[in-house]
Structures are given as structure tokens and as C-alpha cells.
Amino acid sequence: MALTKADIAETLSDKFGFNKRESKELVEQFYDEMSEVLVKGEQIKLSGFGNFELKDKSARPGRNPRTGEDVPISARRVVTFKPGQKLRAQIDNYGTA
């Protein structure tokens, strides 16, 4: 199961009493803010959860796995996520209780 924006908005509505429209707008604003920060090349640090960061990957040679043909892989920017200690601990301990 995947957690969607709609799921997050519904949880906000249920737990905090926001109406559906308000909770959807709040989630959209949060995603927009995160996107804007990353596009500017800045980090997002969510305490206890983890960090999102934009990294530049340089061009490099690659290979088509079907044909074995050499193919250039162009330079690009990627978003990376590094989980925080609390999240790592929760994941490590999942199902062991």
C-alpha cells in the first residue's frame, strides 16, 4: 500500500478537525514548498524523519542491458533522501516487538 496526498489530507481532517478542502490545501502547500526549496538547490531537513537534497550527477558511459551497446548517460540532477536516526530505528525495529 502506498501513502498518497489524499491519505495525508484525510488524516489531517480526521485527527485535527480540518475540513477536507483545508487539509487538501495544506498538503498541497507543503508539497509546493518542498518542491520550491529543492529547485533552488537547498536542503530539506525534517527533524526525526530525514533530509532531502538535490545532487548533480555527471555524465558517464552506460550500457544498454538488452543489446550490450554503449550508451552515454547525460548529466542530471536527482533528489536524494537520507533517513534520520529516529526513522532508521523505527524501520530497524519494525516487526521485532
Swiss-Prot record:
Keyword list, A-Z: DNA recombination, DNA-binding, Transcription, Transcription regulation, Translation regulation
GO molecular function: DNA binding; structural constituent of chromatin
GO terms, biological process: DNA recombination; positive regulation of metabolic process; regulation of DNA-templated transcription; regulation of translation
Name of a matching Pfam family: Bac_DNA_binding
Matching CDD domains: IHF_A
InterPro entries referenced in this protein's UniProt entry, alphabetically: Hist_DNA-bd, Histone-like_DNA-bd_CS, IHF-like_DNA-bd_dom_sf, IHF_alpha
GO-annotated cellular components: cytosol
SMART domains documented for this protein: BHL
Subunit text: Heterodimer of an alpha and a beta chain.
Protein role: This protein is one of the two subunits of integration host factor, a specific DNA-binding protein that functions in genetic recombination as well as in transcriptional and translational control.
NCBIfam families linked to this entry: himA, PRK00285.1
HAMAP family attached to this UniProt entry: IHF_alpha
Similarity comment: Belongs to the bacterial histone-like protein family.
PANTHER family reported for this sequence: DNA-BINDING PROTEIN HU, INTEGRATION HOST FACTOR SUBUNIT ALPHA
Protein name: Integration host factor subunit alpha
Gene name in the database record: ihfA
